[in-house]
Design a protein with these regions (language model features):
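Structural signature of alpha-solenoid helical repeat junctions
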Residues: 68, 75, 92-95, 112-116, ...
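Flexible helix-coil transition and linker loops at the boundaries of alpha-helical arrays
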Residues: 60-71, 102-117, 137-142, 175-181, ...
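Hydrophobic micro-packing sites on short alpha-helices
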Residues: 8-28
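Generic helix N-cap/helix-start motif at coil->alpha-helix transitions
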Residues: 34-40, 68-73, 113-121, 144-153, ...
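Helix-turn-helix repeat elements of alpha-solenoid scaffolds
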Residues: 45-59, 87-105, 125-136, 158-170, ...
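Recognition helix of helix-turn-helix/homeodomain-like DNA-binding domains
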Residues: 1-7, 29-30
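Short coil/turn linking the two alpha-helices of tandem helical-hairpin repeats
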Residues: 77, 82-88, 111, 132, ...
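"A position-specific structural signal for the A-helix of alpha-solenoid helical repeats
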Residues: 42, 75, 79-82, 123, ...
Length: 321
């Protein structure tokens, strides 16, 4: 065989591959396109990301080859959804829905913790909405709206209908509060990241972007828990400005931090309806771990900064009261 004088029969090739503990393709020196399930799923995911229409042909081929593979069916559905939206092609969107339905009973095969039954139903809701089947979309979003996760989608759909606009308000209000709280936490996370790495330029850019948003959140006519939160952010901004050689701007930020802290502690309120656009009479309240009072929150922030210059500036603000 090595000299090319003869070719063994197929059963013998199989036995030889088994004997040498290798695969037949390696034994034959033959490299096939990598069509294993995981590799195929990765190619479909890539086609989805780059919106490659040629991926649909590979998806259909893979679906014939692996009709009962969850990851193949799911990735094919996601590809059809992405391209259906991209091309405004309802036929592709309907195919995506069909594949998502097929994926549901195969979910037990899934090993990706980021994909769950809820993932499938929410994708179906999104596609239903894109197909203008709002009632089906609402039904699915409502069934899976754990902790208000999809209140924004529900509120948006309801608000399109003038007759149901008031029905949308509780959902929009809930979503507003959820996402504003998430934004505050995210900004605080980034701020800690930049401060710990002493990247004061990035910290300054972050606060310059975030503070106008945060200061616009509370209703101006009443005290809000956002005053307490913003007092801490303004104090951090003063710290960053000191570190970047801007003492006058730092003083202005420290003065605003002190003003907001005094304002909050004079009439503290954690009521959710102190936020602009929140539903009037919203009976939920907001919690934070900054400190019992705004004064305590700023002291905790100073401990975190551990910077004598910022502490001295803050003490000056307090003494001037």
């Amino acid at each position: 065989w090595e000299s090319g004088l003869s070719t063994p029969e197929l059963p013998l090739i199989v036995e030889m591959a088994d004997f040498f503990d290798t695969s037949i393709d390696v034994l034959l020196g033959y490299i096939l396109k990598d069509n294993r399930i995981d590799a195929t799923a990765r190619r479909l995911r890539h086609c989805q990301r780059v919106k490659d229409l040629n991926g649909l042909e590979e998806a259909e081929k893979a679906l014939k080859k692996y009709p009962n593979s969850f990851i193949i069916v799911y990735r094919s559905a996601m590809l059809y959804q992405a391209l259906g939206l991209y091309k405004r092609d309802n036929a592709k969107l309907r195919r995506a829905l069909e594949l998502l339905e097929k994926a549901r009973p195969l979910l037990h095969q899934n090993t990706n913790p980021r994909i769950s039954e809820q993932t499938l139903y929410v994708a179906m809701a999104e596609i239903s909405q894109d197909l203008e089947d709002d009632e089906r979309a609402l039904e699915l979003f409502r069934q899976h709206n754990t902790d208000g996760l999809y209140s924004d989608c529900i509120g948006m759909i309801l608000a399109k209908d003038a007759k149901r606009a008031q029905e949308a308000l509780p959902y929009l209000s809930e979503s507003l509060l959820i996402h504003e709280a998430a934004l505050v936490r995210t900004v605080m996370g980034y701020l800690n990241l930049f401060l710990n790495s002493r990247d004061y330029a990035q910290a300054q850019a972050l606060l310059a972007w975030a503070l106008p948003i945060f200061t616009a959140m509370p209703r101006p006519e009443c005290t809000s828990f956002m005053d307490k939160i913003n007092s801490v952010f303004y104090l951090f901004q003063a710290h960053v400005l000191l570190k970047t050689g801007q003492p006058e701007d730092a003083r202005t930020s420290a003065e605003e931090a002190h003003r907001l802290a005094v304002r909050f502690d004079a009439a503290p309120s954690y009521a959710a309806d102190t936020i602009r656009f929140a539903m009037p009479g919203e009976d939920s309240t907001v919690n934070d771990d900054l400190g019992e009072t705004a004064a305590q929150a700023t002291q905790n922030a100073l401990k975190q900064m551990d910077d004598p210059q910022t502490t001295a500036l803050w003490q000056e603000m307090c003494d001037a009261r």
